[in-house]
Amino acid sequence: MSRKIAAIVAALLCSACGAGSAAGTTSEVGVSAPNSWSVRLAIMPADGATHVEVLRDGRPIDAFPVDFRQPVSYTDYLLWPSTSFTYEIRALDGNGQLIDTQRLSVITPAQQGPIPPLYAATSFWNQPIPANPAVDPGSDAMVAKAMVPYRGAANFWAGSNSWAKPLAYANSVSPLYKVGCTKYDCDSTVSFRIPLYAAPSTGSDHHLVVIDSETGKELDMWLAAHEQVTDSWTAAARYVTDPNGWGAICGQKQHCGAAVAAGFAAFGGIVRPEEIAQGHIDHALFFTTPYTRKDYIACPATHTDGQHLEPAAIPQGARIQLDPTFDVDAQPWPRWEKVLARALQKYGAYLGDTGDSLSFAAEATLDRGYDAWSMVGVPAFASLGNLPWSQFRVLALKRC
């Protein structure tokens, strides 16, 4: 353990040492909330402990081995602002017997400033559309053929654990897995830490994104699966990328596979509940449509699974924008829909996959352990049929 981490652990433990207990007979645990979305636990395991389990509000979060009387720092993420959480720290011996339990509660602070978006400030995801952008000559035809006909079933994936994308955060003590591969790009070896609570989406894509907070790496998986009997992870495709990078698996004008069809980093364009709560989304969105163009990759995409050869089909990587002169404030829409619409005017959305419907992507909250979408008033599979779909435009395409 680094001196910095050891110092943090020691400082946190000072306020949590059990008065009247012999040193080492019980675990010592300190807790702090450095921001609105995370809690830091400082754990000094009890004598005889070989493993520690961490639970939040009764839900298992992680489990990991510990060394004799060596402090451990663990950060829990995906928390809600101004909310009380109760942690249970269980110490087990080499036989798996429980030898000590400590419980602590903490209240996260209110959110200060905007929630930080993933990927670099220079990423295409985080760049607003300039004034008077070039519009593609085929824009009207693409909107008329690939968007407007599907408006009746248009939706926002929020509240769906089937099609939204779940996110999990690993710590340096989270279990390290050699992630098996069953279909694409299996010639590379991928080892990554995955916390106990991580679970993929329940729909047919089984997406899962894991960010290692210590190494600053992101694991994107498609058709992810955890085998409980062998405690092993596999995926049909798995890729490691940079959550502070440019937002796709390989560089622009390169072609490569990814956990999503367009070659993007899997959490690119994903709307989070905190962004609705704060009233603004500071990045472009990810969308799908059934009518995608075959054999055409539009920058910044690096791959495609487009289905139709017609020029009126939208190529993956295309960026759409809601007419910025459309008066969103005047609409009788719920607050969350206005937040979405303003983002579509300022940042637009990139076509990232072929879907069964016209949809905008959101975070699945099954890995949070609570329904964050209900807290901001967004229903599951919220309809977007009332968006002015004919007033969207496709910005100038560039083949990659």
Which residue ranges define each predicted feature?
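Pro/Thr/Ser/Gly-rich low-complexity, intrinsically disordered linker/stalk tracts
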Residues: 20-48, 81, 98-111
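C-terminal motif of bacterial Sec signal peptides marking the signal peptidase cleavage site
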Residues: 15-16
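Recognizes extended acidic, P/S/T-rich segments that occur
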Residues: 51-82, 94
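Short, surface-exposed polybasic-aromatic patches that bind anionic ligands, especially phosphate groups
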Residues: 111-400
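Residue-level detector of high-confidence beta-strand sites
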Residues: 63, 101-103, 221
